[in-house]
Amino acid sequence: MSGIKKVVLAYSGGLDTSVILKWLAVTYNCEVVTLTADLGQEEDLDGVDDKAMRTGASRAYVEDLQEEFARDFIFPMMRAGAVYEGRYLLGTSIARPLIAKRLVEIARAEGAQAVAHGATGKGNDQVRFELAVNALAPDLRVIAPWREWDLRSRTQLNAFAEEHGIPISNSAKQYSMDRNMLHCSFEGGELEDPWNEPGPNSYVMAVPMEQAPDEAEYISIDFEHGNPVAVNGERLSPAALVKKLNSIGGRHGIGRLDMVENRFVGIKSRGVYETPGGTLIHIAHRDLEGICIDRETMHLRDAMLPRYAAAIYNGFWFAPEREAMQAMIDVSQQRVTGTVRLKLYKGNAWPVGRQSPNTLYCHDLATFEDCATYDHKDAAGFIKLQGLRIRGYKKG
């Protein structure tokens, strides 16, 4: 690709991106700058910059993006209550726009002509990275080595690494794993047969249900304008709050999901996901909305949710339709302030109490006891008017 003198690479320090780093430098005869993003994946990133430099990078950025990730990406998605195909809380999908954003910002600062990623040609991540770059910097070129090179197997990657002096880990991985503070995902290996039960190595953030405590635990989550702000009365930063709930939910085996989903590229794929803290936030937030948002606003928002979730899953975080939906959602969240009490037990979380200064719940209207506020006779006219359309349709 002519005209490329400098590339910024999303770099994890693993075999794939280390090979990509050297391959870019050799193939394009260009300078390579790396970005390693700390999104709370609980990996030891000490030395990853040194490894990048030894492998041929001219500069290596290692950045702590945890608070930005929680505040500007996880929380807006949680305010929407986004769930893909009714089950998936989008833990991998929501991380890609932030990484792409930083790639673009570093490319601008470094005067780079291109960015590069290590996503394969079969998955969703290639789409997510590249659509984000298209939105933020359409003039930048995007290099996707897995779509260009002739390295097609782990054996070939290892051979390339040995040829160029790249250190290789001898530990074989059972699964392809992706982790950040919101979730951990597992794919490949035995999971490629959808009949196989996930093995014990697929438990990282949450314990197996059989190992969860035999006694229930009660917790409270406070929200302000749709954002979680405190756990058990303790105010925490966005990232610290997610991590706190990961610890609580994980020890009760909460947030495990095993599903076959529809990738944007048209392939069905089986994934096992752990999202303990995100699951608790999602359940509590949805419950609090029940007393804070009026019916029509809630139903309008709910009608958009499949489209909103698909926008994130498919890589359209920076697209105008996602931003427009977010604006409507955030208006709906202005009243969502209050506290939800959850009961946690062996993989389950139930809301058992909720309160809000903005509650729309009226005890006098809801009670089964005698009530002067509501005249039961008024329902007859309401039902008659609602039935006009149906009676006319059936008669015709």
Curated annotation (Swiss-Prot):
L-aspartate binds at residues 120, 124-125. It is found in: Cytoplasm. L-citrulline binds at residues 88, 93, 124, 128, 176, 185, 261, 273. ATP binds at residues 10-18, 37, 118. It catalyses: L-citrulline + L-aspartate + ATP = 2-(N(omega)-L-arginino)succinate + AMP + diphosphate + H(+). Keywords: Amino-acid biosynthesis, Arginine biosynthesis, ATP-binding, Cytoplasm, Ligase, Nucleotide-binding. Transmembrane segments: none annotated. Its EC number is 6.3.4.5. GO terms for cellular component: cytoplasm. Pathway: Amino-acid biosynthesis; L-arginine biosynthesis; L-arginine from L-ornithine and carbamoyl phosphate: step 2/3. GO terms for molecular function: argininosuccinate synthase activity; ATP binding. SUPFAM superfamilies: Adenine nucleotide alpha hydrolases-like, Argininosuccinate synthetase, C-terminal domain. Belongs to the argininosuccinate synthase family. Type 1 subfamily. This is Argininosuccinate synthase. It comes from Nitratidesulfovibrio vulgaris (strain DP4).
